[in-house]
Amino acid sequence: MTQLQFSESARCCRSKERAISMNKNESIAISAAIGRAISENAPYIAYSDTDLKHDYEEYTSDEISALTKAGYIDGDFEKFFVIREFSNSLPIDDIPGAYMRRLFSLAKKLDADIFMHDPYIENVKIKETRRGKILLTKADYVRGEILQYDMPYIDDDIVVPRLGFFTKSVCFPALYEGTVPWVSVCPSEINSMKEQMERACGRVLVLGLGLGYFPYIISAKSSVESITIVEL
C-alpha cells in the first residue's frame, strides 16, 4: 500500500495531507513546487493493467466509497492511481486535505485519440529543422507522464494546478531554444486559446504566430472573414 491510506478510526482518506486550514499563499507555494517537479523532472508513472487491478483489490468497498465521497475518486480508478502515485512522489512533507481533494477532483485522464485527431496535429506535418540554438521538432508525452493540461484553478482561497496524463504516448510540434521549450502545441497551449478561438469572427488580428495553431484553427470558421498576423 502506498502513502495514500486510511486512518483506522474514521477510515478517512489521507496522503501527505494534514487536516488544518490553509491560506492562499500556502496553496500557491505548493502549486509552485508541483510545477517545478513537472518542468524539471518530466515525471511519469509506469504501470500496467495488472498493476491497476492489484492496487484496486487492496481497497475494500467501504474505502472506495470513502474516497469517492471525499472527492478523490470520480469512478475512474486509473486516474486516482496515477495522481496518487505522483502526489506521493512529491518532495513536500505536508499537503492540506482541502488542497489534495481539489487536486484529485481537477485531474483528468486525457484522451490520446482525440488529441491526435485535432485538425492541426493531424494535418500539419513538420520536418525537424535547426537554426543556431533554435530547434523545430516533435515533443511527446509518454503513457502516464504528468502534465498541466490547463491554467490553474484559482478562487479567493486556493490555487491548484490542473494535472493530467495520457494512457498512451502522443507527439506534437514544439520549438526549443537550446534545451528550453519556447512554444509547443500541447494540451495546455490549446486549452489556453479555446475561448478566443470560439469567439473569433470577422477580420481577426493575430499578434504573434507561434506555431500557427490559433490562425490555423480559426481559418476553418465560416464566421472569420480574414486573418492578419503580425510577427516581430
Write out the residue ranges for each language-model feature.
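Residues at the starts of beta-strands that form the adenosine-phosphate
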Residues: 203, 225-226
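Conserved alpha-helix/loop element of class I SAM-dependent methyltransferases that forms part
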Residues: 173, 187-201
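Surface-exposed cleft-lining segments at the edges of enzyme active sites
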Residues: 178-187
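Conserved class I S-adenosyl-L-methionine
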Residues: 202-210
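Short polybasic amphipathic segments
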Residues: 171-177
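Conserved SAM-binding loop of SAM-dependent methyltransferases across substrates and taxa
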Residues: 211-222
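Conserved acidic E/D residue at the C-terminus of a beta-strand in Rossmann-like folds
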Residues: 228-232
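N-terminal auxiliary segments of SAM/dcSAM-dependent transferases
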Residues: 6-9, 16-165
